[in-house]
Amino acid sequence: MKIYMVGGAVRDKLLGLPVTDHDWVVVGATPEALTAQGFLPVGKDFPVFLHPQTREEYALARTERNSARGYRGFEVYAAPEVTLEQDLARRDLTINSIAAPAHPDSAKGLFEPDFDALVDPYGGQRDLQAKVLRHVTDAFREDPVRILRLARFAARFADFSIAPETLAMMWEMVTDGEVDGLVPERVWQELARGLMEDKPSRMFDALRACGALQHLLPEVERLWGVAQSAQYHPEIDTGIHLMMVLDMAAQLGAPLPVRFACLCHDLGKGTTPADVLPRHIGHEERSAKLLKDVCQRLRVPSECREIADVVAREHGNIHRSGEFSPAAVVRLLERCDAFRKPRRFADILLACECDARGRLGFEQTPYPQRPRLLQLLAAAQSVATDKVAAEAMAAGQSGPKIGEWIHQARVEAVRQSAAAAPAP
């Protein structure tokens, strides 16, 4: 029995990056041999075991073959005769197909990888040095999820290029309809992970380069080539703007719901009639409608969906909020449900800041709307609603009239706060 550290742990070690997750493969062993050493079997679809102390996963060496279209089934074969080279061959990219032999530390009951004796049959170290994302074998085409995974790695390793032969294979897979059969949950999973990388725009560059974005997110694909007013958008192209917004969200460390909102905030611009360009009147409502379609199709979690909907509808109003009257500000806060969900409102404002700064030449420009609206929200929240309601009832008011009294009290609080700190 031989044990190797494999995959991302080896790759990241060679790149000098922090190694968080350790993956191990066991060659020449049976399930019985591992359980006899205290390993706990947990694999449902193939033999995977947890180390009795570290709880890290150890998988028996295996081969895989696709048995259905669109990542709906794989035939797995795991046996002692499966070699390390065969196991590495099933992996997606050469940079993920490097193994480090592990030697047991008998005193600790652990395994220590030897990075001076790497096993690299498919040139992963060469591609790491050349900064190339390359498929290992033609088995890449058997799993269309690998297109999404490669695009995600393009976002993580932004200075890597895609090998021409790999891009050609991805094109063939898309042309053959392989991505059309992908399970929606898996598409969302990879999309979400890619959005959280350091350069999410590179994921969409990769998906566009192979034609996959048109199949997975046509609402996003159609934004390229759509003109915007150069006065407000010097980058002009809506697709370019969208990518700048996403990268700004990554730069500001935004959470996933904010990044998804950034992705979808301008979808409606893709349906603006050509004869009215570069104006996009009413694109906010069109964006919200298209967003609903995307969320239903990909089964997007409610937290992401709800923030994206508010951002799509209200980002223009938030940008212009410095011109609003106190009453208009309170109405905006009410539409954003800011009184019930102030933390979500803060995320909505962050998405709007990413939108404003995701423009050519505006990357370093302050966004005063964000701190100002948070200040005005705090002022409106300071209203003692119970006291106002009691006063309204004492004056003979009931039902919606009580809400109107509370609304007016909040307007007055915003008026006073705005007077103390006027909009810049």
Swiss-Prot record:
It comes from the Bacteria. Residues 238-339 form the HD domain. It holds the Pfam family HD. Magnesium is required for nucleotidyltransferase activity. Nickel for phosphatase activity. The gene is cca. One of its GO terms (biological process) is RNA repair. Mg(2+) binds at D21, D23. Its cofactor is Mg(2+); Ni(2+). The keyword Transcription regulation does not apply. It catalyses: a tRNA precursor + 2 CTP + ATP = a tRNA with a 3' CCA end + 3 diphosphate; a tRNA with a 3' CCA end + 2 CTP + ATP = a tRNA with a 3' CCACCA end + 3 diphosphate. This is Multifunctional CCA protein. Belongs to the tRNA nucleotidyltransferase/poly(A) polymerase family. Bacterial CCA-adding enzyme type 1 subfamily. GO terms for molecular function: ATP binding; CCA tRNA nucleotidyltransferase activity; cyclic-nucleotide phosphodiesterase activity; magnesium ion binding; phosphatase activity; tRNA binding. Transmembrane segments: none annotated. Catalyzes the addition and repair of the essential 3'-terminal CCA sequence in tRNAs without using a nucleic acid template. Adds these three nucleotides in the order of C, C, and A to the tRNA nucleotide-73, using CTP and ATP as substrates and producing inorganic pyrophosphate. tRNA 3'-terminal CCA addition is required both for tRNA processing and repair. Also involved in tRNA surveillance by mediating tandem CCA addition to generate a CCACCA at the 3' terminus of unstable tRNAs. While stable tRNAs receive only 3'-terminal CCA, unstable tRNAs are marked with CCACCA and rapidly degraded. InterPro entries: CCA_bact, HD/PDEase_dom, HD_domain, NT_sf, PolA_pol_head_dom, PolyA_RNA-bd, tRNA_CCA-adding_enzyme. It comes from Polaromonas naphthalenivorans (strain CJ2). Its EC number is 2.7.7.72, 3.1.3.-, 3.1.4.-. Monomer. Can also form homodimers and oligomers. ATP binds at G8, R11, R91, R149, R152. The keyword Transferase applies. PROSITE patterns: HD (PS51831). Comprises two domains: an N-terminal domain containing the nucleotidyltransferase activity and a C-terminal HD domain associated with both phosphodiesterase and phosphatase activities. Keywords: ATP-binding, Hydrolase, Magnesium, Metal-binding, Multifunctional enzyme, Nickel, Nucleotide-binding, Nucleotidyltransferase, RNA repair, RNA-binding, Transferase, tRNA processing. A single active site specifically recognizes both ATP and CTP and is responsible for their addition.
